[in-house]
Amino acid sequence: MGWRKHTSRIVYENDWMTVREDEVTNPGGGQNRYGHVQFKNIAVAVLPIDDEGRTRLVGQSRYTLDQYSWELPMGGAPLKEDPLEAAKRELREETGLTASHWRELMRLHPSNSITDEIGIVYVATGLSEGETDLGETEDIEVLTLPLSEAIEMAKDGRITDALSAATLVRVALAQSEEETDQAGNAPVDP
């Protein structure tokens, strides 16, 4: 038996999200009140990689955490906007970069027990430099560093943003598998 929703009401709403409270029957048969957030945007993040194997991180103060955060360039795509176009916009606005090649790397749910938010991550290559176009709420520092160093930042906890950390760890795993395959030591399926 899965979850069964009996009633749902809006507790709070703004331009970016709706907070709902539902009366539900849980999988064990108990009655509960379940609060959750429905986002009106899709999160898009970009892993830019230049011809020298470097990437860009953006650093900014995150109000909800009251701390500084290093993360991939990212933002929100309204549900009716093409996520790739939003990713291109965010990369240009936050770093000044444009890219000639784009590839979707993955989709994930950053916090699936409390929200329906979807995150889409793209890899951007064929980079060209330009000017940033920051919004009034953005006070961003751009850091250019080797991709391997960004991966280390995710591994050692200096990057805590879920989309950024998941992306960098996934890239590290793919690189490790590729190195294993090239060395002829790939695991054999049982």
Please report, for each region that a protein language model flagged, where it lies by residue.
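Acidic pyrophosphate-coordinating catalytic loop
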Residues: 10-14, 63, 108-120, 176
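Hydrophobic residues on conserved beta-strands that form the core of alpha/beta folds
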Residues: 5, 19, 33-34, 58, ...
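Long hydrophobic alpha-helical segments typical of transmembrane helices together
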Residues: 151-190
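Conserved Nudix-box catalytic region and its N-terminal flanking loop in Nudix hydrolases
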Residues: 2, 37-40, 44-89, 190
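A short, amphipathic edge element
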Residues: 1-9
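Acidic, metal-coordinating catalytic segment for phosphate/diphosphate chemistry
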Residues: 9-45, 50-51
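Active-site/binding-pocket entry motifs
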Residues: 25, 63, 128-129
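Unchanged
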Residues: 33, 42-45, 50, 75-163
